[in-house]
Amino acid sequence: MKGLILVGGYGTRLRPLTLTVPKPLVEFGNRPMILHQIEALAAAGVTDIVLAVNYRPEVMVETLKKYEDEFGVSITFSVETEPLGTAGPLKLAESVLKKDNSPFFVLNSDVICDYPFKELADFHQAHGGKGTIVATKVDEPSKYGVIVHDIATPNLIDRFVEKPVEFVGNRINAGLYILNPEVIDLIDLKPTSIEKETFPILVEQKSLYSFDLEGYWMDVGQPKDFLSGTVLYLNSLSKRDPAKLAKGENIVGNVLVDPTAKISPTAKVGPDVVIGPNVVIGDGVRITRSVALSNSHIKDHALVKSTIIGWNSTVGKWARLEGVTVLGDDVEVKDEIYINGGKVLPHKSISVNVPKEAIIM
């Protein structure tokens, strides 16, 4: 089987982290975001994976080619000279995706969930249609494009309603699909949208179905959702592989800690925290609902809440960070500084308080 991951472009919503590395290589749960997807595809029997990229492909190649042997897959890069939307990349990768008659998976690189690829493939084969969309239930469907089903046929999609005013359903497109190769014949090699241009054709042909996703789902393409997704991911990990989570008197709730990190016994870590490689956490530190990326240092008695601390960054003594603050690479926050919702670009030194949301350039 085959899979295509829509990697896309600049990752502007996740800046300042994506000023240093492409978004799929930002560590989520202490490994590059895209690796969660590659591993799940490989586990479902996928042997050929195409990454559709249009930004810094050389960095992606250098980082990801080494995982081919580990997961037993072939990883190829389909490089767009201009952004091709969500359907164009399928046409560009036609030679790989149509190399045999088996269906192929398509997924957005921002999506984190317990990927149900094996079950999805079985469901797709059973209904005999040309495409299947993974659907997830949401509390506020009015923000999304909602899937409406055919009354007579279970799971057959009748139409999509964009941001409905009245309740028509609560299932939305989760950004994961399985499609038959002939779907590529419906796509032109130009910037096109699979959601707006390709799927409506399949709906008209009564050949597009939806598969309900069980468990958590999150598009982690921006900082607040990255942190919310981390909470959901750690909760899922606590159920399916609890041995991976940290234990100890100073650990509260679900916490993932790289073995090379050094945490003071008087620090209190958690709940919902990820600590990366070579991170140092000083005496009396309190950190909750946050991510500390590799080689960062949180000094004594700092308070860190709802924050992403970038690689090689330092948080000073008695500093306080909260409100979805994001530090880019190699940022220094001086002692006793308060930052509330600041987005700090790489290589900055912060010596004055940032009391409300701001971009520090």
Swiss-Prot record:
EC number: 2.7.7.13
A single GO BP: GDP-mannose biosynthetic process
Class of the enzyme per the UniProt entry, highest EC level: transferase
Keyword terms, alphabetized: Cell cycle, Cytoplasm, GTP-binding, Nucleotide-binding, Nucleotidyltransferase, Transferase
Domain of life: Eukaryota
GO molecular function annotation: GTP binding; mannose-1-phosphate guanylyltransferase (GTP) activity
Catalytic activity entry: alpha-D-mannose 1-phosphate + GTP + H(+) = GDP-alpha-D-mannose + diphosphate
One GO cellular component term noted in the UniProt record for this chain: cytoplasm
Keyword match Ribosomal protein: no
Function: Involved in cell wall synthesis where it is required for glycosylation. Involved in cell cycle progression through cell-size checkpoint.
PANTHER family linked: SUGAR-1-PHOSPHATE GUANYL TRANSFERASE
Protein name: Mannose-1-phosphate guanyltransferase
Species of provenance: Kluyveromyces lactis (strain ATCC 8585 / CBS 2359 / DSM 70799 / NBRC 1267 / NRRL Y-1140 / WM37) (Yeast)
